[in-house]
Design a protein with these regions (language model features):
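Short, glycine/charged-rich beta-strand-loop motifs at protein surfaces that mediate ligand recognition
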Residues: 211-214, 238-240
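Conserved alpha/beta cores of soluble small-molecule-handling proteins
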Residues: 1-182, 187-189, 221, 226-300
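Glycine- and Gly-Pro-enriched alpha-helical subdomains that act as flexible
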Residues: 187-211, 217
Length: 300
């Protein structure tokens, strides 16, 4: 059984121990998965692309018709307080200057069970901060293995919803195969992975699926575009079919915790061609270097 750490968390206006945090069994997040979440990385205690995460939080809340319960400044203050408490406590043997993840969850709130959205309900707001689980040097050097699956999830992947059963089932497919991620296709076209966006490289250009209701617009969507422009790599969002992925020169993942991570094996077959077959490629390497620079310049 996992031990819940005795770290500071925020719940409905109060700070307290994560071990003691409780919500009502009638909370609609518990009953229906009726809520949204955000995961904001922090490097050396500084929040990375904070405003972009807040903008996506606003978009998700608007799609669920939930009013944002806090201002940007209030969110920033709470995030920084949780980070400072974690660093001070030295949770999980962390030291000052290490990296953290702030998890934010907002549900519609507590109401009698009914599928119809209730009026005049106060949202439940929960926040916690954890040490970031870093990608290992070996994973960066050798890349990771992924498997593929049909995208069997619901039609609103654009909402960062707490209703994640489809993603859980998808991620378990790769876990059962000892792989890092499950890359999914809907009607033969790439959507995303269970907990990552997916990018392919063809003839030196980075390609990704277009923004749609089937794909969560990861914060790294815009970041990858910016980094490609910075280092002179072509970038294009267009439909990417299954054959494009398996024929790609490179494949890589992006997410808050993976940052950019090369995929070197797909369904047991090496990714890429020639001398770089089954190895991280040069486009990934350039983007990783640019990402490292961005972590310094785009954190507050």
């Amino acid at each position: 059984m996992q031990t819940i750490p005795d770290t500071l968390c925020y719940l409905n206006g109060e700070y307290g121990s994560l071990r003691d945090a409780k919500v009502s069994v009638l909370d609609r997040g518990f009953m229906f998965g009726d809520g949204i979440y955000e995961v904001v990385p922090a490097y050396g205690g500084k929040l990375f692309r904070f405003d972009e995460h807040m903008a996506r939080l606003d978009r998700s809340l608007a799609k669920l018709r939930i009013a944002n319960p806090h201002t940007r400044e209030e969110w920033l203050e709470r995030c920084r307080k949780l980070i400072a408490a974690l660093v001070l406590q030295g949770a999980a043997q962390q030291t000052p200057g290490s990296d953290q993840i702030v998890y934010i969850q907002i549900t519609r709130g507590v109401a009698l069970r009914d599928h119809v959205m209730p009026a005049d309900v106060t949202p439940t707001v929960f926040m916690m901060c954890s040490p970031m689980k870093l990608v290992t040097a070996e994973q960066r050097h050798a890349g990771v293995a992924c498997v593929t699956a049909r995208d069997f999830r619901w039609e609103r992947g654009d909402i960062k919803s707490t209703s994640l059963l489809g993603n859980v089932l998808a991620r378990q497919i790769s876990a059962d195969h000892g792989a890092a991620e499950t890359i999914m296709f809907r009607d033969g076209f790439l959507t995303e992975a269970a907990a990552s966006n997916v990018w392919v490289v063809h003839e030196g250009a980075v390609l990704g699926p277009p923004k749609s209701e089937h794909v969560l617009e990861g914060i790294r969507y815009e970041l990858i575009r910016e980094l490609c422009a910075e280092v002179g790599i072509a970038y294009n969002l267009r439909p990417v079919n299954e054959a494009d992925v398996f024929a790609a020169d490179e494949v890589f993942l992006s997410s808050a915790t993976k940052e950019v991570l090369p995929v070197t094996s797909l369904d047991g077959q090496p990714v890429g061609h020639g001398a770089l077959r089954g190895k991280p490629g040069p486009v990934y390497a350039r983007l990783h270097e640019a990402y490292e620079r961005a972590k310094v310049t785009q954190s507050i």
